[in-house]
């Protein structure tokens, strides 16, 4: 056997062992292990090893991107029943953006498993954010093809959804959503908004709103619309709760 082929087989055997250990760590066993390996195969590796172009992870990345958007959308839709479409979209974008995906990938040491060409390896590709985000999406695509949506949901429940529950993305929410998320996380009870006052002429109305937690007043706010008044009341409530914590 030519030395080059011997070296490649030894290299691939080492990675197969690493992928088995990775599956044990996740508690997931792929029926088709080739899908798992493909999810971590960068185009530079395919080019250098004269493999077919479709054997890299780009198609799986395409699929995983769609699966990730669907599952995260469903989770947010169920978790925040009163959140507006605009706020849901903004929150989802923060969860599936490149920096977030890189964070998830790094927590599971995805970079150490990526199959790279020598050039990409030498230029630090293993730690390149865009590459890691792509690999995370490709892994989601491979997991979906191999085991279906339920397993993807279970994986995200362990890796991604806890970050949402811990408030990691609260900074992109409006004040009402932030307050709702904080109350849900602490299990403190129910919040309600009440318009206490409407004043001024029809063309220049001002509304005063109060937000309560279990019937105890948390904050007051005013604005040119009911929505704005409620947002300001929620902002005051958040300030008070953060001062108390």
Curated annotation (Swiss-Prot):
Identify which residues the record assigns to the active site: 65, 137
Required cofactor(s): Mg(2+)
Q: Keywords in alphabetical order, please.
A: Cytoplasm, Endonuclease, Hydrolase, Magnesium, Metal-binding, mRNA processing, Nuclease, RNA-binding, rRNA processing, rRNA-binding, tRNA processing
| InterPro entries in the cross-refs | dsRBD_dom, RNase_III, RNase_III_dom, RNase_III_sf
- Domain DRBM, by residue range, is 174-243
Alphabetical GO biological process terms:
mRNA processing; regulation of gene expression; rRNA processing; tRNA processing
Catalysed reaction, written as an equation: Endonucleolytic cleavage to 5'-phosphomonoester
Q: Which GO terms describe its molecular function?
A: double-stranded RNA binding; metal ion binding; ribonuclease III activity; rRNA binding
Q: Does the keyword Acetylation apply?
A: no
Provide the RNase III domain boundaries: 19-148
Q: Where does Mg(2+) bind?
A: 61, 134, 137
Superkingdom classification of source: Bacteria
The enzyme's main class, written as a single word, is hydrolase
The record's annotation in SMART domains points to: DSRM, RIBOc
Q: Does the keyword Cytoplasm apply?
A: yes
Q: Which Pfam families does the record cross-reference, listed alphabetically? A: dsrm, Ribonucleas_3_3
Where does the signal sequence lie? none
Q: Where in the cell is it found?
A: Cytoplasm
Regarding protein family, the annotation reads: Belongs to the ribonuclease III family.
Quaternary structure annotation from Swiss-Prot or TrEMBL: Homodimer.
Outline what the protein does: Digests double-stranded RNA. Involved in the processing of primary rRNA transcript to yield the immediate precursors to the large and small rRNAs (23S and 16S). Processes some mRNAs, and tRNAs when they are encoded in the rRNA operon. Processes pre-crRNA and tracrRNA of type II CRISPR loci if present in the organism.
Q: Tell me what this protein is called.
A: Ribonuclease 3
Q: Which organism is it from?
A: Bacillus cytotoxicus (strain DSM 22905 / CIP 110041 / 391-98 / NVH 391-98)
């Amino acid at each position: 056997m030519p030395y080059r082929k011997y070296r490649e087989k030894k290299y691939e055997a080492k990675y197969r062992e690493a992928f088995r250990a990775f599956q044990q760590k996740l508690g997931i066993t792929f029926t088709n292990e080739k899908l798992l390996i493909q999810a971590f195969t960068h185009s530079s590796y395919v080019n250098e090893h004269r493999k077919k172009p479709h054997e890299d992870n780009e198609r799986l990345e395409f699929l995983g991107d769609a699966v990730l958007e669907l599952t995260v959308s469903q989770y947010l839709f169920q978790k925040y029943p009163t959140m507006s479409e605009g706020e849901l979209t903004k929150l989802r974008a923060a969860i599936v953006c490149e920096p977030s995906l890189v964070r998830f990938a790094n927590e599971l040491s995805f970079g150490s498993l990526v199959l790279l060409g020598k050039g990409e390896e030498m230029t630090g590709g293993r730690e390149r954010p865009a590459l890691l985000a792509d690999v995370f999406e490709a892994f989601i695509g491979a997991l979906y093809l191999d085991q279906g949506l339920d397993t993807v949901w279970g994986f995200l429940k362990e890796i991604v959804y806890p970050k949402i529950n811990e408030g990691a993305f609260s900074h992109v929410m409006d004040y009402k959503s932030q307050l709702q998320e904080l109350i849900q996380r602490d299990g403190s009870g129910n919040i309600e908004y009440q318009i206490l006052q409407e004043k001024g002429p029809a063309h220049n109305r001002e509304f005063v709103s109060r937000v309560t937690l279990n019937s105890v007043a948390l904050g007051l706010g005013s604005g040119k619309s009911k929505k704005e008044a409620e947002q300001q009341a929620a902002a005051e409530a958040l300030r008070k709760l953060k001062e108390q914590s």
